Structures are given as structure tokens and as C-alpha cells.
Amino acid sequence: LQGYIKRGSLKTVKIQKRGGKGKTGITTRNEDSVVQTLSVNTHTSVLFFSTEGLVYKIKAWKIPEGSASSKGKSLFNILPLKNHQSISSIMPFPESEEDSSKYQIVFATSKGKVRKNSLEDFSSINTSGKIAMKLDTNDRIIGVKICKDDQDIILSTKFGKCIRFESKKLRIFKGRSSKGIKGIELAPNDEIVSLSIIDNNKMKKNGKNTKDDKSELAAKQKFILSISENGFGKKTSHYDYRTTNRGGKGIIGIINSPRN
């Protein structure tokens, strides 16, 4: 949250069973917490999106390497950030930048706005950064993902609501200066906390599937992992999240209880 970053070898990360204490990956400062991790190689370009709606781009090898117990380096020493800025989301650029025309990039903001652009719009970013998205007062970018037209978008809120809609029904914006359009109808004091992209696989609307259909559904099944602030989680089949129109109120994804 306070803008520190580092890179390390995947060899230092081991698979563990659920429910364990885990292993130290980074030492955090007071009231700081880890918000995002990526798996990249040293030649991958990484996009950094700021709370002010700007985007920066650097190669992964320029991020200082650190041990599991190190605190990392401040992003202010790596990117030309101003004092009031912080990074809200990071995203790896496809390794083959020539393929950027095949993909789109989706933005989601805390106030429920979404926007889709061609990834080509972000292939050339100078060292001083570029405008990625205009934001309303008190709004901020909470997630940025790469997607294709045959995938769906899922937005999740602080109060446990979710909405799923087709990416192809969200038009591609031609510029980077738009504020986007409504992705979900938020309740008072609620806000978007997560943006996810999943494959567009659905059950038949009449609910009747043949044996072959069911085998194919099982093979294509994906799962949504919902984790609460206090560390409780649940795994749900993506078939349980029906596809609706963008801008609706969504469904309950996880109960927002005092325990969670």
C-alpha cells in the first residue's frame, strides 16, 4: 500500500497446504500490506497504473531484486511519481508486444466505472508516463486486466456483491481520456474491490445438458476464489455466476458477515 516493490526468484517460493502460516515474502513497514504479486521474466514490460489515472511502463529487470526478508525499494525511486500519487494496479504486458492488437485492456474503478481499450493504446509509454483514464473526484483505479471478446468480466464489491457480463458487450473506447461507463449499480458506501476475467463458458439456459455436454462443462469449469479481509475464503464454480447486463446490481458472491 505504501509503494514499495521488489522482484525475486520463483525458486524461493514453495507449494504449501491450505491453512498454514506461510513464509515471509517481504518485510512490511507499520500498517503496510502487500496488495499485488506478478509472475514475470526479466524482459517482461510491466505497466504501473497510478491513483491519479496515469500509466508508466518499465522492464521487469529494472525493478531491484531483493531477498525474501527485504523491504523492497520505494516506487518513487523507480518511477517519476509526484508526492500525492501512489500505484493502484500493476500488469504485465504480453511478452510479444506485436500481438497487442489481439487483446483489449479493461479498467475498473472503485465507484463502479469500467472501460475497455485496445492494448495497442498502451504499447508506447514514455518515461514520464501517460494518461490512462480520467477519474471523477474521490474515484480511483482498482484493477486493470487484459481480456479478449470471448471472455467475461467479473466485478466484486466490498459488501460481497458480484456482477458478471460479457466483454464483447463493452465497447472499445478510442481514447485514453474517457471516464468509462457504469459497470455495476453500487449500494450506498459500497465500492468495487476486485476485477476478474474468466472464459465465456456457460450452461444451457434450459438447464438440460446431455452426458457429453456435462463432460465438456466439467472440463471447462473454472473457479472463483473469494477471500475476505480477515482471511476467510470460499471457492465457487464460475457456472454459479450467471451472466447479466452491465450496470445491474449483481448477486451475492460472499456473505459480508462480522467474521469476514
Where are these regions (language model features)?
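Short, structured "edge-of-domain" segments at secondary-structure transitions
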Residues: 1-260
